[in-house]
Amino acid sequence: MPIKIADGLSAKEKLHEEGIFTIDKGMALHQDIRPLRILILNLMPLKKPTELQLLRLLGDSPLQVEVDFCHTETHESTHTDPSYLEENYYVFDEIKDNYYDGLIITGAPVEQIPFESVDYWPEMKTYFEWAKTHAFSTLHFCWGAQAALYYYYGIEKRLLPAKLFGIFEYQLTQKHHPLLRGFDDRYFIPQSRHTAINDIQVYNTPQLDILSRSVENGINIIGTPDHRRFFVLGQVFFFILQVEIILEEEYLRDKKKGLPIAVPKNYYPNDNDTKRPYFTWCSYAHLFYHNWLNIVYQETPYDLQAIAKVHPCAH
């Protein structure tokens, strides 16, 4: 939420430099307030746990948030009852005329398949095009981030020589970016993936800002200067409470089967899998969503249909 201060206060300029929202008395008196409308394209096979994680994070805000869920129509879900989807989810044709303050596109377990070979890829392209004019700011996660970077900017993904598995440190490259307000200079997040994007292509794309990265594992968070698109390479920011369980279950499952699996890096104290894992990423996930909703609240036009005109999105 913005803070109302006197227009001549000496701290005002510094606060603006740090990306902290302020308004004067006149703006406060005429400020229009309405619920934020958020659409979630849930690509995960297990829809219900993903819903719970995202709603926990979106609900931890003083802002009123109105959430719709949608799913791909061209892919038949085998892990969620069709009647549940029919009752609680939309398909594209049902929301295509709507406008949203924010859109969230989750990951999907298809990272090792070429984009064009994913059965719902044509539908993904439709969502990406639609988002240009119907959603102010979009969060893309994991495969959703890889897919969007490929569609919008032609950035390729690549197969890693070994699975990235464990808890990894990343450093901020834009400390005062509003999406990262309150983050420490470094933060730790879980990773469990076989692919990565081509970082060199990102560096050579002037429409993109790199917000955080690591020397060991490359880029983690990317954004556009107009805040219309953010890309997060990793699942921590929507599996906040489940990642601890997921990493351990995945490790113990493969170990029990005798499959080649390394102990998740930086996960167990002294790499001892009989001890309780460290849980070091929860606060960053809450902070991340708080900051994103604040950006959306401050910058989206009150009249959502004005999104395309007032905030043209760079291609």
Regions found by a protein language model. Give the residues of each.
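Cysteine-nucleophile active-site neighborhood
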Residues: 100, 105-174
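Surface-exposed, flexible loop/turn segments at secondary-structure boundaries
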Residues: 46, 75, 111, 146, ...
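N-terminal beta-loop-helix "entrance" segment that forms/cooperates
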Residues: 73-86
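Active-site-proximal flexible loops/turns
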Residues: 78, 149, 200
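Amide-donor transfer/coupling interface in amidating biosynthetic enzymes
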Residues: 1-71, 89-95, 99, 126, ...
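Short, glycine/acidic-enriched capping/hinge loops at junctions between secondary-structure elements
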Residues: 50-53, 79-82, 115-116
